[in-house]
Amino acid sequence: MLKIRLARGGAKKRPYYSIVVADSHSPRDGRFIEKVGTYNPLLKKDDANRVTLKVESIQEWLKKGAQPTDRVARFLAAQGLVAWTHGNNPEKGKPGKKAQERLAERAQREEERKQAEADAKAAAEAEKAAAAEAAAAAAAAPAVEEAPAEEAPAAEAPAEEAAEG
């Protein structure tokens, strides 16, 4: 199968690519059939020499069945040679199995923590309510005990007056 792809050249940290037609089994920078263009990523994006293509030669190879790689297809689409569509791979961005398991565990721990906080808050509210109820009962109980105590001396006072008189 024939591919139209990039073959890297240039020095370390200074890439320069040749756009070549090559067998898909040959190495990236190895043997190729024909050089059909160049790509220099170091030049500015609006520079005319950033991508140079031999359009007639590329059209011939496309007719013969050569398949462009994604990056080369973008260059060819810019020249109007092929219709390039953005590939959509929603699976690529998803985390792996282990990461999903860790996320599930973290979510479960967070849920348990929130539940524990809610339980603790409810227990604190119940304790407060019980303490308030006990305080109210304690306040009501002495008031009830004191009220008959006040009446009793008042009842004794007339009895004492009657005994004296």
From Swiss-Prot:
Q: Which GO terms describe its molecular function?
A: structural constituent of ribosome
Protein name (record) = Small ribosomal subunit protein bS16
Which superkingdom, per the lineage? Bacteria
- Which PANTHER family has this protein been placed in? 30S RIBOSOMAL PROTEIN S16, SMALL RIBOSOMAL SUBUNIT PROTEIN BS16M
**Which family, according to UniProt?**
Belongs to the bacterial ribosomal protein bS16 family.
Q: Does the keyword Ribosomal protein apply?
A: yes
Where is this chain compositionally biased, Basic and acidic residues type? 89-130
Q: Which GO terms describe its biological process?
A: translation
HAMAP family, alphabetized: Ribosomal_bS16
- What is the scientific name of the source organism? Caulobacter vibrioides (strain NA1000 / CB15N)
Q: What GO cellular-component annotations does this UniProt entry give? A: cytoplasm; small ribosomal subunit
Q: Where is the signal peptide?
A: none
Q: Identify the keywords attached in UniProt to this record, alphabetized.
A: Ribonucleoprotein, Ribosomal protein
Q: Where is this region: Disordered?
A: 84-165
Please list the residue ranges that the record marks as compositionally biased, kind Low complexity: 131-157
